[in-house]
């Protein structure tokens, strides 16, 4: 609770300095990362709603970040309706072309309430994986983009699940040394040229990477 409120307060103060900035309220997986949440709908909606209430006073829109199933996305959207704010959806694909739930990106189009949808991103994915899925996310016909990571892999492994609260994910998943700000920006420019309008970094990206993104033409 403290961290959610504190982050909101800091973001809100920063917005006073930069009025054109929009503050996103991140709503990440409420259970395991990179795994579909198979708990009951009541449990999931309660978790999303509880976090959304904490950050709602500080944010302009909500961002569902690194979700691994369409069910989670639908429940998440339902959980924030009372706040009447737009939202961005960030889906995760560890490897290949399917969400951890086994669903495809194209399955989203018939399952999303798009009335306040700002767009869809592939979230916490490698540049190479975004490239594989670029055409399919583009074919959704809505604003799209990415949050690129710098991990060697994000495919779940048993010890990652077991130690998720006690181990550093960077140690378990490995960190790439080749994705310098310059290299990451080259990927981002390529995706921007292909139509991506939502550009961002996730795990193992640094302020220097984001600065490089901000300078793209």
Task: List the predicted regions and their residue ranges.
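Domain-level signal for soluble alpha/beta catalytic cores
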Residues: 1-217
């Amino acid at each position: 609770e403290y961290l959610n409120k504190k982050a909101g307060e800091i973001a809100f103060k920063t917005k006073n300095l930069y009025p054109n900035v929009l503050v996103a309220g991140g709503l990440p997986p409420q259970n395991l990362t990179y795994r579909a949440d198979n708990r009951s709908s009541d449990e999931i909606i309660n978790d999303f709603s509880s976090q959304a209430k904490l950050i709602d006073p500080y944010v302009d829109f909500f961002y569902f970040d690194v979700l691994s199933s369409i069910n989670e996305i639908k429940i998440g959207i339902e959980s924030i309706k009372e706040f009447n704010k737009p939202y961005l959806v960030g889906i995760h694909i560890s490897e290949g072309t399917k969400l951890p739930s086994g669903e495809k990106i194209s399955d989203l189009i018939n399952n999303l309430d798009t009335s306040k949808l700002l767009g869809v991103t592939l979230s916490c994915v490698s540049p190479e994986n975004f490239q594989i899925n670029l055409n399919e996310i583009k074919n959704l016909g809505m604003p799209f983009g990415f949050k690129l990571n710098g991990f060697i892999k994000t495919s779940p492994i048993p010890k990652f699940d077991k130690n998720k609260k006690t181990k550093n994910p960077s140690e378990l998943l490995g960190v790439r040394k080749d994705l310098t700000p310059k290299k990451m920006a080259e990927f981002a420019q390529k995706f921007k040229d292909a139509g991506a309008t939502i550009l961002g970094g996730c795990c193992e990206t640094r302020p220097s990477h984001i600065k490089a993104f901000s300078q793209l033409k």
